[in-house]
Amino acid sequence: MRIAFFLLVLAVIIGFAYGYSCPKPCYGNMCCSTSPNNQYYLTDFCGSTSACGPVPSCSGALYFTADSQRFGCGKYLNLCRSGKCVKAQIYDAGPAMWVEQDAGMMIIDASPTICHVLTGGSSCGWSDHFLITATVTSLTDSRPLGPFNVTESEMAQLFIDHEIAMAQCEAEKTCNGFDLE
């Protein structure tokens, strides 16, 4: 009986430690899948190369993210946490799949400015477990890049807009690693 209990506890611990597995690996070391509930951990980055063209400067108030393999280069995301949101543009790919596996969840890599706006902190690592919601913006969204607040009904509309935008990019094969097929 003790052995069975020990094995059960061990299985639960291993399940938590290795609970995340990317449903759609791509580019050798990244995940092309999107979160079914739009929930991600927030991390920050400032790179010297970009998968989508020019490298944004890491100084100043800039609103950019990675995750082009999921959503497409140049697309816009609304990143939200506790009613506060930031509209950002996708400039790069990433993060590496091993980072998400270590975190146990999908990640949105964003500029240090976004990290500060949404958390009040100076850095965001996967072990901080800053949970955010990420949605692709509507094609008709004219909101400028940067922070904004949302009500519950506005947040619900962001989810609707996200579903429409994702259906379009999947039809056009410009997201979720469709260019690999």
Swiss-Prot record:
GO cellular component: cytoplasmic vesicle; cytoplasmic vesicle lumen; vesicle lumen
Uppermost EC category: hydrolase
Location of the protein in the cell: Cytoplasmic vesicle lumen
Temperature-related properties: Stable when incubated at 50 degrees Celsius for 10 minutes at pH 5.5. Activity decreases by 50% when incubated at 60 degrees Celsius for 10 minutes at pH 5.5.
A biological process from GO: phagocytosis
Signal peptide: 1-19
UniProt-recorded Gene Ontology molecular function terms: lysozyme activity
Catalytic activity annotation: Hydrolysis of 1,4-beta-linkages between N-acetylmuramic acid and N-acetyl-D-glucosamine residues in a peptidoglycan
Phenotype of the disrupted gene, per the record: Mutants have only 40% of the wild-type lysozyme activity and initially form plaques on bacterial lawns that are only half the size of wild type plaques. Despite the lysozyme activity remaining constantly at 40% of wild-type, the efficiency of plaque formation gradually increases over several weeks repeated plating until the size of mutant plaques finally exceeds that of wild-type cells by almost 2-fold.
Origin: domain of life: Eukaryota
UniProt keyword annotations, A-Z: Antibiotic, Antimicrobial, Bacteriolytic enzyme, Cytoplasmic vesicle, Disulfide bond, Glycosidase, Hydrolase, Signal
Enzyme Commission no: 3.2.1.n3
Membership in a protein family: Belongs to the dictyostelium lysozyme family.
Job description of the protein: Has antibacterial activity against the Gram-positive bacteria B.subtilis, B.megaterium and M.luteus. No antibacterial activity detected against the Gram-positive bacterium S.aureus or against the Gram-negative bacterium E.coli. Lacks chitinase activity.
Entry protein name: Lysozyme A
